Amino acid sequence: KLTWLDKTFNSVSIIIFICLMIPQSFVLPVEKMKKSDYNQKSYWYYPWGKSGTHKGVDIFGKKGTNVVSPVRGFTFATGNGKHSGKYVIVLGPKLRFHYFAHLNSINTNVGNWKSLGEKTGTIGDSGNAIGKPAHLHYSIVSWLPHFWRIDNDPQGYRKMFFLNPIEFLNDCFKN
């Protein structure tokens, strides 16, 4: 007879397996963005302010430009942080969190389904980006660790969770 713990473990395992098997389609997270709107070397740039290492990419654009969901998924969180400013987190396929920070406006609510390319907010300069050129800070964080990504870079152990968004952006420009 299966115990409550066995049933829970089996259920969670099935959910994780299904989430990992869902194919991921990806579109650019900023409307009408160009490859020149982001720096190819900005991911894991060190040193980078209070965080030590830049764990994403900054995509520069005109304040108010639409930020869209690059994947299908659920709005996991929204808020306004001291450093991030206005932010949105979308949970997409492969149990990956897509993090959008320094927004000027938020156009979604927690629990909302986001379709591919659906507006989530607008480029801004909120949080510690006040007084700097308007941009979107975009990160992709895996819920499951990718141990093979750990290296000797500063905070390199954290690479098991932070994926390089520039690889995804560059793939969009190849098509």
Feature map (PLM): residue ranges:
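Zn2+-dependent peptidoglycan hydrolase active-site motif and core
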Residues: 69-107, 133-137
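Glycine-centered loop/turn positions within well-structured domains
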Residues: 57, 65, 98, 106, ...
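Surface-exposed, glycine-biased beta-strand/turn segments
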Residues: 2-86, 115-116, 125, 162-175
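Aromatic side chains
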Residues: 38, 43, 99-100, 138
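Conserved, short, structured surface segments that act as functional micro-motifs
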Residues: 113-175
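A generic structural motif
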Residues: 60, 91-93, 141
